């Protein structure tokens, strides 16, 4: 090519390199298609591994499930079967165990009791549960799962967490503890202000509702729970008016647009979704999977009081993102009913907070 007029030696080398790369990629696509892999997926695999894809597929095709978006356990297992990987392969069993945990997360669970995990994996993989106990330990050694002893009714055994969910739970608990800063405003002064709010709004607060306001004033974190008709909305309104009289900045939010609209209608104050409150960037609201929030520990919310309604619908990932954006000194009030709609994502956050 360098002999062709107008093509320098450097340009000729670049053209030759590109042609060789295209030839190599074409060969890789033909190789992958033997195992039922589409061209689109093949391009992703080649982009990730290059010419190393041959050794990856030969040694451990289950790496695809971890490394390539769009390749789950099922596809990797199908490829492994075509290549001739044994059904009791260590790679297959460990990948299958992680897949069972991911299915549980899709159903809202951040962990499974080990016996349940092994039983489900046995059904999926066709391998005896007892033969897979060592693989659970191997995953724990690799920090891909975390084991935590727990009581499950009449038995005690390890709960098996995917590592990410374990640390989300741990981090959430730590941040809630840090936020729960007590103050000591005199109860008599709080009650006098509540008398003023009652008179102004021509309402009568029950003693339990007054106590909730007192707790909100004197604690960094408060949970208000109860079924429909138990006075949660009246209590929230009293809390809002109390802090408004103190000149504090109050933010209201809920997990979904519909819940935020109901909160606005019930209180008369503007509420947003949690995603909008945290300034979701680049993704659709009501889906926190992989979301990037502009509000975080480096750019926290500038609020004195944050009230979150419909907490039963908040999953562990969204809760972690919310707490990361709340400064110590901000009062956080969580409102909800554990018997209402659960979160779509993993983690029964409201119930766990109440139980703790």
Residue ranges of model-derived segments:
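Conserved ATP-binding/catalytic motifs of P-loop helicase motor domains
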Residues: 1-356
């Amino acid at each position: 090519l360098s002999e062709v007029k107008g093509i320098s030696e450097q340009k000729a080398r670049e053209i030759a390199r590109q042609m060789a790369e295209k030839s190599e990629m074409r060969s890789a696509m033909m190789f992958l298609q033997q195992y039922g892999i589409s061209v689109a997926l093949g391009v992703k695999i080649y982009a990730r591994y290059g010419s190393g894809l041959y050794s990856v597929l030969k040694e451990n095709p289950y790496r695809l499930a971890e490394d390539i978006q769009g390749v789950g356990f099922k596809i990797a297992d199908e490829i492994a079967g075509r290549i001739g990987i044994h059904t009791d392969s260590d790679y297959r069993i460990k990948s299958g165990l992680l897949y069972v945990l991911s299915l549980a997360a899709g159903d809202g669970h951040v962990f499974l009791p080990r016996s349940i995990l092994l039983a489900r994996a046995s059904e999926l993989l066709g391998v005896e549960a007892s033969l897979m106990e060592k693989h659970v330990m191997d995953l724990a050694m690799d920090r891909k799962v975390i084991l935590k002893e727990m009581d499950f009714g009449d038995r005690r055994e390890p709960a098996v967490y995917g590592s990410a969910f374990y640390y989300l739970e741990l981090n959430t608990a730590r941040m809630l503890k840090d936020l729960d800063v007590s103050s000591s405003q005199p109860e008599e002064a709080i009650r006098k202000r509540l008398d003023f709010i009652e008179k102004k709004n021509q309402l009568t607060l029950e003693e339990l509702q007054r106590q909730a306001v007192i707790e909100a004033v004197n604690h960094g974190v408060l949970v208000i729970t109860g079924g429909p008709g138990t006075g949660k909305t009246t209590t929230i309104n009293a809390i809002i008016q109390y802090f408004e009289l103190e000149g504090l900045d109050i933010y209201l939010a809920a997990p979904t647009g519909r819940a935020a609209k109901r909160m606005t209608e019930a209180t008369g104050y503007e509420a947003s979704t949690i995603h909008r409150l945290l300034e979701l960037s680049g993704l659709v609201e009501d889906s926190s999977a992989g979301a990037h929030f502009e509000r975080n520990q480096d750019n926290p919310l500038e609020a004195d009081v944050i009230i979150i309604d419909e907490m039963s619908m908040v999953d562990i990932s969204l809760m972690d993102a919310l707490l990361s954006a709340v400064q110590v000194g901000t009062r956080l009030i969580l409102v909800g009913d554990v018997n209402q709609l659960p979160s779509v994502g993993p983690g029964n956050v409201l119930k766990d907070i109440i139980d703790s």
